[in-house]
């Protein structure tokens, strides 16, 4: 914690105060924010803050002020140079300069990698497609076997005179 680093540079009593603040920070934090909001809005109603919490708020204010004083950037135009100047890269005499990639000799205009990847990809697609079609054909064979096992006896052919109307006689209304 930044506050802890500040207190280490102060006295032993300050470290004890910080330990107390850390121990009670969760319970204190919400009320301290509420206290600051009301103080900034200049509301004069009495607040439910114990004297101990008031001391803690004063300590935290003091510590934050000290931290801001110590870590304030100097005023003025922004720095244009980095803190640590960059050293120019010097190539030693032992190192060889990097050579550009040279294409292996071949009849094709395309680089070797592109040709390899195209061939490899087309072979992979072909094998995947053939596996897929083999699977579909196998499923078709299974369906034929299942159809033959579940084949139902054919229904006896009905005469043309055997209508569904005769099964369910309905009186026709005549007007």
Curated annotation (Swiss-Prot):
The keyword Lyase does not apply. GO terms for cellular component: virion component. Residues 68-112, 153-175 are annotated as: Disordered. It is found in: Virion. The keyword Iron does not apply. Induction: Expressed in the late phase of the viral replicative cycle. Residues 94-105 have a biased composition (Low complexity). Disulfide bonds: none annotated. Keywords: Late protein, Virion. Belongs to the asfivirus H171R family. This is Uncharacterized protein H171R. It comes from African swine fever virus (isolate Tick/Malawi/Lil 20-1/1983) (ASFV). The lineage of its organism: Viruses, Varidnaviria, Bamfordvirae, Nucleocytoviricota, Pokkesviricetes.
């Amino acid at each position: 914690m930044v506050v802890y680093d500040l207190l280490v540079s102060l006295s032993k009593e300050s470290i004890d105060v910080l330990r107390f603040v850390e121990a009670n920070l969760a319970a204190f934090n919400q009320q301290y924010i509420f206290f600051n909001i009301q103080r900034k809005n200049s509301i004069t109603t009495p607040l439910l803050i114990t004297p101990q919490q008031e001391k803690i708020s004063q300590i935290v204010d003091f510590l934050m002020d000290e931290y801001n004083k110590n870590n304030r950037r100097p005023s003025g135009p922004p720095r244009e140079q980095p803190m640590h100047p960059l050293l120019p890269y010097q190539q030693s005499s032992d190192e060889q300069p990097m050579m550009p990639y040279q294409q292996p000799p071949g009849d094709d205009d395309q680089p070797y990698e592109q040709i390899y990847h195209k061939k490899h990809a087309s072979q992979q697609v072909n094998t995947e497609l053939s596996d897929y079609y083999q699977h579909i054909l196998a499923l078709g064979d299974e369906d034929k076997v299942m159809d033959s096992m579940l084949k139902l006896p054919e229904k006896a052919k009905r005469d043309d005179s055997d209508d569904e109307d005769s099964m369910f006689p309905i009186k026709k209304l005549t007007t």
